[in-house]
């Protein structure tokens, strides 16, 4: 089977760019890999493009927007998850701007897709009574207990 241009560039993106040049964490690799797996599933199920036929020309702004909508409508992804998937695709497009300059406009159109705002979780703090209760749980009749109380009290 002949390797498609998409497969060749995606492999290089992961092995040469992300791991070699950028030195990203294994968690980033895992997240980006999952994002592209979802994209391949979307293209197969919704657009009828199998992974072994996928070409760079298929990755357009419209396709990416439809993919992001599919994530939220079908997969019930939150805005934060949608933005995380978009970040993976944007990173790939940033890489592709230098690898495939004849499609520079295509990559820049995808890069112009905006992230959706999402509500950030507020940090809950312990109340004064909660702090007193927590500190009261530390046994102060031992050396380690007094040490622990001193450390936590700071």
Description of each model-found segment:
Residues 1-154:
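Conserved catalytic core of the tyrosine transesterase superfamily
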């Amino acid at each position: 089977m002949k390797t498609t241009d998409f497969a060749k560039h995606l492999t290089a993106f992961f092995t040469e760019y992300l791991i070699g040049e950028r030195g990203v964490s294994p968690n980033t690799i895992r997240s980006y890999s999952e994002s592209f797996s979802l994209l391949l599933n979307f293209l197969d199920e919704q657009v009828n493009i199998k992974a072994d036929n996928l070409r760079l020309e298929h990755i357009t702004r419209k396709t990416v927007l439809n993919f992001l909508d599919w994530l939220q409508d079908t997969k019930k992804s939150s805005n934060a998850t949608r933005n995380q998937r978009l970040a993976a695709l944007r990173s790939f497009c940033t890489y592709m701007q230098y690898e495939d300059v004849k499609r520079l406009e295509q990559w820049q159109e995808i890069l112009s897709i905006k992230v959706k705002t999402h509500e950030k979780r507020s940090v809950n703090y312990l109340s004064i009574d909660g702090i007193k209760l927590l500190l009261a749980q530390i046994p102060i009749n031992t050396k380690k207990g007094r040490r622990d109380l001193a450390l936590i009290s700071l």
